[in-house]
Amino acid sequence: MQKTPISIGIDLGHSSVKVSVKSANKIALNGATTIFPTVVRNWTKISNEETARKALADTVEVNGKKFFVGVTAQLQGQAENFSGQSRNWIETEQHDALLVAAWIRAQRILAQNDMGDANTFSLVLGLPASYYDEQREPLRKRALALITKIIQPDQKLRVFIESQSRAPLLCVAFDAYGSETGRAGDSESWGVVEIGHYTTDFTFHDRGQEVDGAASSASGAHLVYDRIAASFKAAGYLSDTDTITNAIKTRKIKSFGQEIDVGHMVEPAIQEFSSYIQEEVATRFGEKAQRMDGLIVAGGGAYMVGSDIKANYPNAIVPTNPRFAVAEGYSRFGLLTL
């Protein structure tokens, strides 16, 4: 019996890893997406049996070495920073561990949908615009070699590398099942601002062509984290990633059991970042933004600055789930390759 081919899109972000899984039979999968923090720590033995059992789901082995990833790595390692805050992190064992963990989570999604025996896969990963050309082939080869080691002999895998900034546009050009929508084609112009943790990526597609000169990168939402971390340290508060992430969401932290309002520290950091991004949008797109059919603002940072960009650009669009726009775009592209 012919088994349904599978598309897996993995956005290995610098603050969280997002996974989107789709089947070529155009039937939506239950629980088709998942997300976990971009944190990796060397494995250590956990003495508490219940904690150790829970940690198994966040434990991976790469080249004979075991790692904790995600929430377990965050808690057991008391992480103050996300992993992979460097340009060449695709060459690190931390990146390898996150990719393997994401692949395993994708397989769990398939198993939950009674598709655990799938044997044909398209895996789509991505890179920031500024070093897409340089790292595309090294990443493809590394990912293929890594995942080939853990799949079955009868399973077929192809790996594709996309530009992060192009991925949200794929969500406009194709629907959730990989069918063309009629948008973003030869008669339309679109811009994308993809605000990740490490970089913010820009791209401009003009009447069916990606304009190379417009594909570029600026700093990402780590600027917000860095400023808040400095403020928290000066005030004597914890400045780990978990504390800062929750503070951005709620404007509050807990200190010695007491809930403290830190909005006066968080808001200036976000407003400074918003001003920076809007300046970058104006510089990189200029008057071209006026003739765009749409300006997509995606990525995790869209939650912080999306409304400000929309206030200045009436054609700006923030996807329903901007954090997953890249992984979703990857998985839609993967359907086209099956």
Where are these regions (language model features)?
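Flexible, glycine/charged-enriched surface loops at secondary-structure junctions
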Residues: D240-T243
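Intrinsically disordered or highly flexible coil/loop and linker segments, enriched in small
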Residues: Y237-L238, Q290
